[in-house]
Every structure is written in structure tokens, then in C-alpha cells.
């Protein structure tokens, strides 16, 4: 078995290695080369680059040391791999001595050795991966008439697809500075050496000899192998099925894993059907997969995709040229059968969406097929069931369609504007150059567009969208009808005085005579003014000071007839006249009617544009498109696409978006729920252990556990009770005459005492303490302090006894906390009555554990319950935990029984709690008066300093260790229904567009869906989202923050322009807009830091069709939101005026915010140090 030794030399800056007989002694090429021919030694035909470019003439290698040039055998050119393949290892090692970067490897056959010499280590990995060797790369001695020879690596095989060379559709000539517009397409198989352009000929590229001679250098031959293999026929069939099935995610993953699914070895589209040579775009046009077609066109236009295909050796110019070539191929390449382009396929099948995608690219051409027909001539030829609407739309798309866009600057340096109508063949200019600075330009982006439509209709739509209609005579504008503004100025026509008398009616002629200054000037001579200094000539020097005459209105006949009427109309006090005062009711009625009609398109559109810069133009354009029954597309950053979100397709995309977010939240919370289950398991095990310890006190007390660190439990409890006893004694002494205050204070102290006792009972270190004697012990301590107090007189003692008797009688039949108070009062009364006869010692003498135990043994036990649930804070916390556990069980389901687990029953007991809806980990409470009335509690107090929320837990099964006897019933004074107490458990909706809280983008989508009915069955997520959004008030919606920290995504262009448009920045605004009256726009970076009561700002309805406006009115220092009614047109207009004028600058916004916040609180003069000032 023969062995071959291959030497791999990486490509250097000087170029690739070229073999010769003197350098590669002993190689296969050196041994088998033919003898040199001196006659032909003057020049040698050197191989060009492996990219298949035209061969170039090179001189011999200067390293040979002889004047004679080397001889090149056609079978063994200098770049043949056989120059570096040896049969003797010693000969191969000689090459390694001269080239330090060379690598040597042994192979069992010549085929693998050639692959290694050409492509290095990657070829070996490819052989192992695909189980086949690289084909041979031998020269093809085909000599054309011009004397050029094909490159040895220019054969069309699966391994000749080096992105830097073989068969590249476009290549920028070296040293060429011509723009990409100079790249021409040609059908000739060869190119002239003097040509200055690139020619595509049979999928191969050739360099120009003239450029080679002007800038001679070594050919850029890549020694690296192709980074991607050619897909097999079975893989191409599977790829075609994925396209036909509409699996866009799978298609995207396939083409980015291996670009060869879209680009063949000749840098042309890959044929997915060999017979008729259908590429991916033909398949999409046949089955109407517009989204996949948009993805493919966007991908082949992406510089990163071609760079991935080309590799690291490819330049930016090469990638740009390849993008242009591929885009032109995919849009305009005809099939082999009928010579039809993808546009023909989409037009004859009646696929409107596919035609829209294709014609949106300016590179798409309307070519003729073999029958000489263009796509517009075969509309719906293969679709007999096409509707008339479909045919009309296709005709509109194929016959010069026009669109009206919204242009926004990507850096927010320019306000948005309505762009001029354009067609795909003539796209708009997205480079806005400043007038003052010619070198500066601003990049614009299309954020929405309406169309397609005819050019005439597009111009009308553009004028209507850009300039709202003026208010007519019969519809009164709020500015014109308001007494606070001047009359509407009407500019007369310039040609009004040029009309002849015969061309106008007598009425019009009379009006011109009465109201025309020209008529007055021609009918009467103009009086001569008296000029000072007795001269009519004007001196043209600085010494002449001309007096300033008062403003004179032009004299007209009607103004001469009634001069007072004109001035009275403009007098500010004109409304104070008796005549107008008598007609005040008529004025109010007229203004009311005008106000209802004044919310017309003109006023609403201007208000929306000025107040909502982010989406104002889109709101107006969307409504106009619906009125004109035109298609509307709008870019939504969270969907990263242009679409009308109110259509069926848009709602489906929104539903899919919410569904995806739901799945993501479920995946993220899965680990959290698992940890929650584990914690509940540990809690249940701890509860069982504590129960076992309570059953056997003696054994648990003697146990030496790590938690038993307190050796004096009675001393600790005694010291704590002494603190409470001192506070109770102080309260009794200071408030001896106020029984109500003493009752409330004792209730609060006993509530805290219960919390302390519960914590002691939950701790295993205090198991030996008998807590049933707590009331007797604390009464004993209070009696001791009262008896030994010097402040307590005999009269106070008698008064205290009388008060305790009254409290005991009142609290005899009470339960809960009042029962505890009655028990303490009874014990305290008994101690104080027996104090003169019995010895009551001070507790300071109890300093040891033995003395404390002896003192506790003398106390009496009581029947009061010391359950943990009687503590409000503890019970609330445990109830909340139980409700959250119920939500966990509802969302995750019951856990399976695990055999052999010690605490399995306890685990299921802790997890098997009631049911609630998904997402109820955070709950909100809604007021329910009936539920509050049904609650009867024995330990419920509502403190003003603490917001306490209780839930109705009657339908929820609590976990083990929780008691439902007393915590289900609460009671508060019936005369005050507290909103914080009257609550029902409801799940909080937390699925919004950009997180758990609504943003301005949610409001924008809600405006777009305001007139759309959402089906709860088919669109459950959208229905839930819209219901949650509609629950917010207008004041809360004004406080929604703008989406600032949004992931930057590249928007899908609605059309594909030149290569520069593909690298444009996304449409998301990196800067915050400060021209909308939103609280988040006033203070950047703050979230929810505004006042508790938001200032109610006047705000128009969410859509132009609505006319509800809220106005904030001040009444007794409180902000009250009132709805505008027709009876108060002046107030409503003032509010609208304030809405349009108050938010001018960020500083004014902040000032207005804080001033409204301060006005909401009514200060008393006695509360401030400045109250006594005059």
C-alpha cells in the first residue's frame, strides 16, 4: 500500500505557494513534469486565482537564481497540489525546513493528500464528517481563442465554491474606485481585457487585464477550504417542504446554519427543483408564503449573511456586490420552462401578499416570459375563483402604485412629518440635509405608510393628512367661537379685483364695493396729510424724526357707514353690554352647539399631533386610511414588523406575541415554583416536628438540639411581661379619667402582647413555659406597679377600681381580643382588691430562673386561646402564604405521591390548598361591601398608620398548621367602611407588552384596537390584555411611561433599496421625547415617583371618533375630575387651551407638576410658621 505525504503551506501576504522543480524536488509534479522547451521559456502562463478569474501573465520566480524562466506544464501548473505531495518523507521534510508555517501529514491515498494540500486541516474534518473525500482538482486544458486558460479550480463542483473566488457572481476589481452603479449585467460568456466593468457570464467571474496591468500583484488565492458544504438533494427537498409548509423559524435556522441552501457554487440561487430550476422565491410565489419570501429577501440583502458565506477573507465591497447580485437573481430570474419570474407566478395565481412583497423592492422588474407577456397581463390567470377586489388590488400593485409615508428621524433631532407620495420604483430620499449646514444630514426612517393607491389619490390623501381641513362657515371652530381669541383672519383671493363686472354676479360686485379698499380709493380722492415742517418731501438723513402715527385700518364704504361696530367687535368689554347680557342664554346654547361640533377633524387632529409626537401622526393617518378604505401599515417595535394591528393578521401576531411571553414567564417561574414547593415541604416537616415536641414536653426540653440555646425561658418571658406591665401602668395612671382611651390603649398593648406570646410559642426553646398563666402574671405585675407607685392616690385607686369593674361588665360576653382584655381586667381587679391584705412584691427581686418559676407557679390559669392566628400580622402573613400556595397548586397541579418519602403526606397537605387563577402570586383587592359585611372578626382593627389588607378565605383550604376558626371572621366598626379592609381576592393581570406594567406602547396599541371587537374564545390573551387596559382611567393612562429600555431590533423594511438602506439603524428612538404631556416624559429615568394623587390633566379621547374630555377643577383645595358637558363651553375651552399651552418645555412641565401637587393639600394657617404673617 502506497503512502503519500502532503505538505500544507498557509496563504501569506505574498500570495500562495507556487511550485517549481528546484523547490519541490521529489514531489509527484517534479517527477512527472515534461522536459522544458527553451522556445517557450520566455513566458509562462501562470494560474490565476482560484476564484475562476481570467489568467494573467507572470514572469518566472526570481528565487531560482537563473535568468531562464521556468517551464509550466499544462498538467502541472505552479499552483497544482501535486507540487507538495511526496512519496518520500525525507523530500517532504526539506520543504518544512524552508517554510516554518508548513505542516506535514501522511495519507493512505492521493485524493486525501490533495485535499489536505489545498484546504488544510478543515478538509480532514470535512472528510470525517461527511464520509467522502474531496474531488480531484486537476487543470482543464481548454484554450480559448484569446489565449486564456481556465483556472484549475474553476470546475463547477461541490468543492469549488470558495466564497472568495470560485464562481462569485460579482467582484470588485483591484484598484477600482468605481461605484456599485457601474456594475452591469451581461449575457456574453467572456469579457474584453479592456473592459472596465464586471460581467456575469455563466455564473463565473473574470478580472480585467487592464486593471491587472495597472496594479500587478499576486493573485488572492485562498488556501482555506469552503466553510460550508453543498446540501444534498434530499436536504434540498426537505428545505423546499419547509418553505411550502410555512415554517419560518425552521427556514431561518437552516439558511443561517448553511448559506449554501440559498447560494449555489456559482454565487447564484440554489435550484430547489432541478427540472424547471425553481429557486426558493419561485416556491414562495407558488404557495403564497409572503412572510418567508420577505425573510429570504431580507437575508440575502444582509451584509452579515454574505460575510458569513464569504468568510473572513471577503471584503466589504465583495459582500455588497454579492448582495446586489443575489437580490437581482432572486427577484428577476426566470424559470427554465416558461421563462417566468416569481412576479409572474404570484400574479397569475392571484397572491396579493406575495405581489406586495415583490413590488416593494425597486430591483423587481416587470419582464416578459417566453410568450411575451408581462405579469400585469396574466393577473389571476390560474385562479378562477379570484374576487373582483383581488383583481383590482393586483392591477393597482402592478400599475405604478403609490404610498404616503410617515418619516421620522432615527435620532429624534427632527419632528416627524408626512412624506411626499412615492412609488417603489422611485423610493423616498431618507437623507435629510440641513439648509444651514450642507455637510450635516439626518437619517430618516419610515414608521408608517398608507397605500397602495393611484398617484392622484395619493396626492389628495397627502394633502388631507398633512393639513387638516379648515373650519367652514356652518361648523364653528373653538378658536373662532371663543371670546378669548381674535376673529379668524381670512385672506382674500388675489384675483378678486381683477374680475370684470360681467364675470361676477351683482351681489358679489356689491360686496366688493362695500368691503374693498380699492373701490374706496378709486371712488374718492385720498386726502393729503399734513407733514410737519411744512414740506411734503421726506428728508433722507438721520435728523428727520418722523412721528409715529396711530394704526389706521383701511377705509371701506361699509366701515365708514358703521365705524363703531368694527371697534366694538374688537373691544374686550363688548360682552359686558346689556344687549349681549340679555342674549347670554342664546350665546351659551350657540357655544354649546359649536363646542359639540368644534371637536371636528381639524381641532382633534392638530391636538393629537401636538400632544403625542411618538404616535400622533400614525393615529391620524390610521383613522384617515379607514375612512378612505385604504390599507395601512405601521411599524411596531415589539413585533418588529410593519402591519395593521387591527386586522386579522395583526391580531393573530399580537396573540402570538402574548402567548410567547406567557410561555417565557412560565419557563422562568418553573424553577421558582420548584423552590416554593421545597420550602413548603420543609415548613410542613417543621410543623410536624413542633407538634411532636409539644406532645412530649419533658422529652423535648431535655433534648440537646442546636436550636436550644436559651437556658432561662421563664426569665426571658418575665422580662418581656415586665415591659408590657410598665407601659400598661403608665397608661392607667395618665388616662385615669378617660375610659375610652384606656380601652383602646389596652387593646393595642394586648395585641402586641399576643404577637410576642405567639412568637414564644413557635420557638422550641420556650416549650417548658406555661403560657396559660400570662394574663394572671401580667395582671399581678400591673397591680404591683400600681400599688408601689407614689403617683396613685386613694381617690385614683378607687376610680381605677370602678373603671375596671365597668370594663369587666362590658367585656363579659366578648370574644377574641376583647375577651383577652376582660380576662386581664378581671385578674387586675382581683389583685388590686386583695392588695391591702396580700403581699404584692416588686418584680425586681426575681433575678434567677428558680424565682421566676416559683412566681409563675402561684399564678392562675385562664381559658384564653393563644393561637397563632389571633395575631393580625402573623395571620395575615400566613393567610397570604396559603393563598399563594393555592395559586401554585392551581398553576402547577398536584404533585405525584412519592413512595418511601417520610413527609409525603405533609407535603400534599401543604400543597393541597384551594384554587385560584394563574398569576395570583401578587393579588390586588377590590372593594366589596357585601363581603365586608359578612366578615365578623374578633381581632380586626384598622390602624391609620398601617395599611392592612384582609382577604376572604372562606373558600380556600388552608395548609397544615393554620386554623380557620377565628381568622375567617373579622369585625370593624360598622359606621366606617374602610377601603383597605373591604377587599376581595382577585388575580392581578401582569402580562403587558414590555413587562408587568403598562407603558405608552400599550396605550398606542389600545388606541389602534379601540374600534375592534376582540373575541374571547379565539384571542384570549388579547382579550385579557384589552380588558386590563380599559380598567385604567385617563389620568392613569397619562402617567404610563414610554418604552425606553427596549431591546434594539432591526425593523423589516417595507421595501429594499440600495445596500446602504440595509445597514440603517432601527426605528426605535434612543432619546426620550419631551413634547408629550406625560409624567414619564417630564422626569426621565423615574418610574412611579410622582404624587400619590396624580394631577388630572385635560386629555382628548383615545381615538378621533370619541369626544370625551376630562377637566380638572379645584373645589375646596381638592382636585375633582369632572366631565365636560354642553352647559359649560367656556370652562371646557379653557381646559383645552390649557392642555395645549401648559406643556411647552420640560421645565414648565416640572413646575406644573409640583404646583398641582401642592395645591391638592389645603394648609391651615396654624400649621405653618408663616400662618401669622399678614
Curated annotation (Swiss-Prot):
Traits of the deletion mutant: Animals die as third instar larvae, are smaller than wild-type and show very severely reduced brain volume. Complete disruption of brain morphology, especially the optic lobe, in 3rd instar larvae.
GO biological process, alphabetically ordered: asymmetric neuroblast division; asymmetric protein localization involved in cell fate determination; endoplasmic reticulum organization; mitotic nuclear membrane reassembly; nuclear membrane reassembly; spindle localization
Keyword check for Ligase: no
Transmembrane annotation, as ranges: none
Entry's Gene Ontology molecular function annotations: protein phosphatase 2A binding
Start-end of Polar residues biased regions: 521-532
InterPro entries: ANKLE2_3rd, Ankyrin_rpt, Ankyrin_rpt-contain_sf
Function statement: Involved in brain development probably by regulating asymmetric division of neuroblasts. Regulates neuroblast asymmetric cell division by controlling asymmetric protein localization of Mira, Baz, Par-6 and aPKC, and spindle alignment. Also, regulates the localization of kinase Ball during mitosis, specifically maintaining Ball in the nucleus during interphase. Required for proper ER and nuclear envelope morphology in neuroblasts.
Family: Belongs to the ANKLE2 family.
The protein's name in its UniProt record: Ankyrin repeat and LEM domain-containing protein 2 homolog
Organism: Drosophila melanogaster (Fruit fly)
Name of encoding gene: Ankle2
